[in-house]
């Protein structure tokens, strides 16, 4: 009888141990699930910001008369991350065909002007 009580106690301890391990595993997985949700939310916000900036750049290009066709990134189509290097050469080719220079080059050319001319409003 004492041996049965001992076996019952061991079985009970084994169940408790398994329950604690399961609970511990679930507790460690919860923060990762929350972290994943936060990461997805942040990535969605980054994509929305990217699309907004892209739309502003397209509108700016149309306003300046550079081109009505601007390169579109695969990131806006399929939600994947692309590097700046992937889009920059396209922009360079697009601008070279119109005779326009990217704004960074214009800013460098303006540095050589006299101080009485404004960089924002260059003299013709």
Curated annotation (Swiss-Prot):
Pfam families with a match to the protein in the record: DUF4681
Listed InterPro entries: DUF4681
Recorded superkingdom: Eukaryota
Compositional bias per record (Polar residues), positions renumbered to this chain: 65-86, 98-124
Chain segments carrying region Disordered: 1-31, 59-124
Name of the protein: Uncharacterized protein C12orf54 homolog
């Amino acid at each position: 009888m004492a041996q049965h009580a001992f076996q019952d106690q061991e079985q009970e301890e084994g169940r408790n141990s398994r329950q604690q391990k399961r609970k511990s595993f679930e507790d460690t997985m919860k923060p990762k699930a929350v972290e994943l949700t936060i990461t997805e939310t942040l990535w969605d916000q980054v994509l929305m910001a990217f699309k907004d900036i892209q739309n502003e750049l397209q509108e700016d290009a149309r306003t300046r008369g550079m081109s009505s066709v601007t390169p579109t990134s695969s990131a806006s189509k399929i939600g994947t991350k692309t590097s700046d290097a992937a889009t920059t050469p396209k922009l360079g080719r697009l601008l070279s065909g119109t005779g326009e220079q990217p704004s960074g080059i214009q800013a460098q050319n303006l540095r050589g002007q006299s101080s009485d001319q404004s960089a924002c409003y260059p003299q013709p």
